[in-house]
UniProtKB/Swiss-Prot annotation:
Protein name (record): Urease accessory protein UreG
Reported function: Facilitates the functional incorporation of the urease nickel metallocenter. This process requires GTP hydrolysis, probably effectuated by UreG.
Keywords per UniProt: Chaperone, Cytoplasm, GTP-binding, Nickel insertion, Nucleotide-binding
Gene Ontology molecular function: GTP binding; GTPase activity; nickel cation binding
Species of the source: Methylobacterium nodulans (strain LMG 21967 / CNCM I-2342 / ORS 2060)
Lineage per the UniProt record: Bacteria, Pseudomonadati, Pseudomonadota, Alphaproteobacteria, Hyphomicrobiales
Length: 204
């Protein structure tokens, strides 16, 4: 049961379409559900597909997964007008008063997407090696200012000609001392490291 007077830790997970946000949500749910009382909120523009995928994967019981249809720019629903997501958080807290952790996945967006501090206490940003080794040096708030940068699909690097050493050097240059992790989430690689970061940085 959460002991924080501020309520459960809220972790925002952002990143472009197809980068691996839902895979990270699934991995974190499975890694943390035995130790913490948690739920998941997903954002899609016109469907609740990501929520359905999490349910089918058995990440959490169906009642602990809520899909939000943003009906427009997914960036707006996590930043400029986060009211629809704040309402979802409030509803989950009503259903499960003992929550320790709420994971909030944004809809796919560009590198400029960021979470409102009103919505997320901790932010994870997922990028995809298949997008090319140039992605880290393109910058953007998600890459430079997220609490943890997740560089996913490392297994695809040889197939797309991406040099992970170059990506790491660019990541260090763009992020300074902020942490990052390389993952291959579909293979289960790196999930525990991300989960450990959430627990430690989030004070769980």
């Amino acid at each position: 049961m959460t002991t924080s007077r501020h309520g459960p830790l809220r972790v925002g997970i952002g990143g472009p379409v197809g980068s691996g946000k839902t895979a990270l949500m699934e991995g974190l749910c499975k890694a943390l559900r035995a130790r913490y009382d948690l739920c998941a909120i997903t954002n899609d523009i016109y469907t609740k597909e990501d929520a359905r995928l999490l349910t089918v994967a058995g990440a959490l019981p169906e009642e602990r997964i809520m899909g939000v249809e943003t009906g427009g720019c997914p960036h707006t629903a996590i930043r400029e007008d986060a009211s629809i997501n704040l309402a979802a958080v409030a509803e989950m807290r009503r259903r499960f008063p003992a929550l320790d952790l709420i994971l909030i996945e944004s809809g796919g967006d560009n590198l400029a997407a960021t979470f409102s501090p009103e919505l997320a206490d901790l932010t994870l940003y997922v990028i995809d090696v298949a997008g090319g080794e140039k992605i880290p040096r393109k910058g953007g708030p998600g890459i430079t200012r997220s609490d943890l940068l997740v560089i996913n699909k490392t297994d695809l690097a040889p197939l797309v000609g991406a040099d992970l050493a170059v990506m790491e050097a660019d990541t260090r240059r763009m992020r300074g001392s902020r942490p990052y992790v390389f993952t291959s989430l579909r293979q289960g690689e790196g999930v525990e490291e991300v989960a450990r970061f959430v627990v430690e940085a989030g004070g769980l």
